[in-house]
Structures are given as C-alpha cells and as structure tokens.
UniProtKB/Swiss-Prot annotation:
GO MF: rRNA binding; structural constituent of ribosome; tRNA binding
Protein's UniProt name: Small ribosomal subunit protein uS12
Keywords: Methylation, Ribonucleoprotein, Ribosomal protein, RNA-binding, rRNA-binding, tRNA-binding
GO biological process assignments: translation
NCBIfam families listed in its UniProt record: rpsL_bact
Function comment: With S4 and S5 plays an important role in translational accuracy. Interacts with and stabilizes bases of the 16S rRNA that are involved in tRNA selection in the A site and with the mRNA backbone. Located at the interface of the 30S and 50S subunits, it traverses the body of the 30S subunit contacting proteins on the other side and probably holding the rRNA structure together. The combined cluster of proteins S8, S12 and S17 appears to hold together the shoulder and platform of the 30S subunit.
Entry's Gene Ontology cellular component terms: small ribosomal subunit
Native source organism of the sequence: Bacillus pumilus (strain SAFR-032)
Record PANTHER family: 30S RIBOSOMAL PROTEIN S12 FAMILY MEMBER
Modification 3-methylthioaspartic acid occurs at: 102
Disulfide bonds: none
Subunit details: Part of the 30S ribosomal subunit. Contacts proteins S8 and S17. May interact with IF1 in the 30S initiation complex.
Taxonomic superkingdom: Bacteria
Length: 139
C-alpha cells in the first residue's frame, strides 16, 4: 500500500489496453513512406494467398482463409465467412476486425459482398452479414 506522499510524487498509472486488431490502427503515407496512427473500421487489401486450415483441438473442419496485404503494407490472415467463395490471388478485398476463436493467428474477417468478394449464394437468413441481396418476390 503506497503512502500519500508516494502517490503525490508518482501517482497511479492507468493500464494501456492493447488493440485486438492492430493492423486497422495504422495508416500509410506513400509520399513520405511512413506509417501514421490513423485508425479505421475496415481496410482494403489484396489477397496474396487463399487456402484452408484446420481448427484447434475439439473442432474439425477446413476453414477458408486468405493472406491479405493491406493498403498500409501490413500483411494479415483473414477468415472468409460463409459457404463457398470466389476469391483467388490478387483479389481486392475489404477486411474488418473480429477473430476466429478456433484458428490461431486469424484476427480479421473478410467482408462479403464488398469489392471483389461476392455474397453467399442462396442465403435467406442473416443476409446482411454475408452480402446477399434480397431475393426477388415471385407473384
């Protein structure tokens, strides 16, 4: 327990909370060739590789992921949600934060229905999360 005098001299230092999606907290100035501290909710990037990986212990699947070089020159691993996708190398994608609990090192999600990423075909519920347009009403 500190004394009053110690608190007057030093004071309490509040903990700094680390970001869970650090690549979204950096911008890049291409003229000055330096990183800037500009935060953004999403970032654009180019896929450098697209593949599948297996999840951690109790689960079993082939989860789709893409390695993405962002516009701030940081390379991250992003999860491709939904069933089926049209991504390949050099596809331009939009990523958002949000980790995948059973894939180590995957801290970002690709936004479906934005830029080169198509929405999920035949999706009827939760369409907004998968970039699917509303189906036409037949009379």
């Amino acid at each position: 327990m500190p004394t009053i005098n110690q608190l007057i001299r030093k004071g309490r230092v509040s903990k700094v909370e680390n970001s869970k999606s650090p690549a979204l907290n950096k911008g890049y100035n291409s003229f000055k060739k330096e990183h800037t501290n500009v935060t953004s909710p999403q970032k654009r990037g180019v896929c450098t590789r697209v593949g599948t990986m297996t999840p951690k212990k109790p689960n079993s699947a082939l989860r789709k992921y893409a390695r993405v070089r962002l516009s701030n020159l940081i390379e991250v691993t992003a999860y491709i949600p939904g069933i089926g996708h049209n991504l390949q190398e050099h596809s331009v994608v939009l990523i958002r934060g949000g980790r995948v609990k059973d894939l180590p090192g995957v801290r970002y999600h690709i936004v479906r229905g934005a830029l080169d990423t198509a929405g999920v075909d035949g999706r009827m519920q939760g369409r907004s999360k998968y970039g699917t347009k509303r189906p036409k009403q037949s009379k």
